[in-house]
A protein has these predicted regions:
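Alpha-helical transmembrane segments of multi-pass secondary-active solute transporters
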Residues: 120, 150, 208, 292-293
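Small-residue-rich packing faces within the transmembrane alpha-helices of Major Facilitator Superfamily
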Residues: 59, 159-160, 300-304
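Hydrophobic transmembrane-helix bundles of small-molecule transporters
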Residues: 1-90, 97, 115, 123
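Hydrophobic transmembrane architecture of multi-pass small-molecule transporters
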Residues: 194-195, 215-309, 320
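Residue-level hotspots within transmembrane alpha-helices of multi-pass secondary transporters
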Residues: 30, 136-140, 191, 221, ...
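Transmembrane core module of solute transporters
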Residues: 20, 47, 68-203
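Interfacial helix-cap and linker-helix signal at transmembrane-aqueous boundaries
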Residues: 36, 109-110, 141-142, 230-235
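Cytoplasmic loop-to-transmembrane helix junctions
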Residues: 204-211
Length: 320
């Protein structure tokens, strides 16, 4: 039905794919994420700093190339539009925070609260349902109120949800927090995406849509890597500072690699020692979840500030 009801627009001046730009962007992403993971795993060593600096350098080369070739992979001219910049930044920060916290939340439900995979999935179902509800309501809201107001309110509500998750622990804190987060973030991925596409010239709408999708995927991957690195540092610090008498240094190092490793190691130790290790590991992972939740709250508040500043004069979107 798509070809019959969806009119297609083709850019008559579309150029060829620049393979060098593809390779540069891929190298920049991989080097940066590798550097972040090495930084969390081994500290500020030669490998981590070299990878991060190399990733930044390759990223700079990529951006420089985009400004000098006829058919860039990333059209920097799109960023001249303030609504485009604001919506894309909010989109990126929201995805970064959401994916970064979610990776900890699923482990927390199973390895700290002891839920089965099915129970953990059911515990996250309210978040998903509220996200769907918020997405379905967003077009009606956007037809009545300015997009900036909806996005700022949604991002502020999401920040409150992240903060609630960072303040408490247990299932009865987590589920209400994720409900608020889902309702608040939904407009960012619906209204925000529409602003990204409609802010671009018609001949660049495809490029804007592709950039929106790419930013979402990249921000999600970066959120997992960045928040995972921060959370791992918090978890290890809590585990190292815990009183665990008689636990060998190599066992403590293995437990510090991941919560799953600590749970597995606890099963091989004497009962009293395994219980102490498991309690310390679960407390440390709870600290890590709360730290990443607060980081997520800060990020979405920054996104709300950007939207409030750059989208002040944008009217309500047309209905439909």
């Amino acid at each position: 039905l798509g070809p019959c009801f969806l009119p297609e627009y083709r850019d008559p001046d579309a150029g060829h794919l620049d393979l060098a730009s593809v390779l540069l962007s891929l190298a920049a992403v991989l080097l940066t994420i590798y550097g972040l993971k090495q930084l969390a795993e081994h500290g500020a060593g030669l490998a981590s700093m070299a990878a991060l600096l190399a990733g930044l350098a390759v990223g700079a080369l990529f951006l420089r190339r985009q400004g000098h070739i006829a058919y860039p992979l990333l059209d920097l001219r799109l960023f001249a539009h303030a609504p485009f910049r604001a919506a894309l930044a909010a989109y990126a920060l929201a995805a970064l925070a959401m994916f970064g916290v979610y990776i900890f939340m699923t482990q927390y439900l199973q390895l700290v609260l002891g839920l089965s995979p099915l129970q953990a999935g059911l515990a996250t179902l309210p978040w998903s349902l509220c996200f769907v509800i918020g997405s379905l309501l967003s077009p009606q809201l956007a037809a009545r109120w300015p997009a900036a107001r909806i996005l700022v309110v949604g991002l502020s509500a999401a920040a409150f949800g992240f903060a609630v998750l960072g303040l408490g622990q247990g299932l009865w804190w987590l589920v209400p927090a994720t409900i608020v987060m889902g309702l608040g973030l939904a407009p960012v991925f619906t209204i925000g995406n529409e602003i990204i596409i409609t802010s671009a010239p018609s001949e660049r709408a495809g490029a804007a849509s592709a950039l929106s999708e790419t930013v979402s995927e990249f921000s999600g991957a970066l959120g997992i890597a960045l928040f995972g690195s921060v959370g791992l540092v918090v978890y290890r610090q809590a585990l190292t500072s815990a009183a665990l008498p008689g636990l060998p240094a190599d066992a403590l190092q293995a437990a510090g690699a991941s919560l799953g490793g600590a749970v597995h190691l606890a099963d091989t130790l004497p009962a009293w020692q395994g219980a102490a290790l498991l309690a310390a590991a679960r407390a440390g992972f709870t600290d890590a979840l709360q730290a990443t939740a607060w980081a997520g709250a800060v990020l979405v508040l920054v996104a709300a500030g950007l939207v409030a500043r750059l989208l002040r004069k944008r009217p309500a979107l047309a209905s439909g």
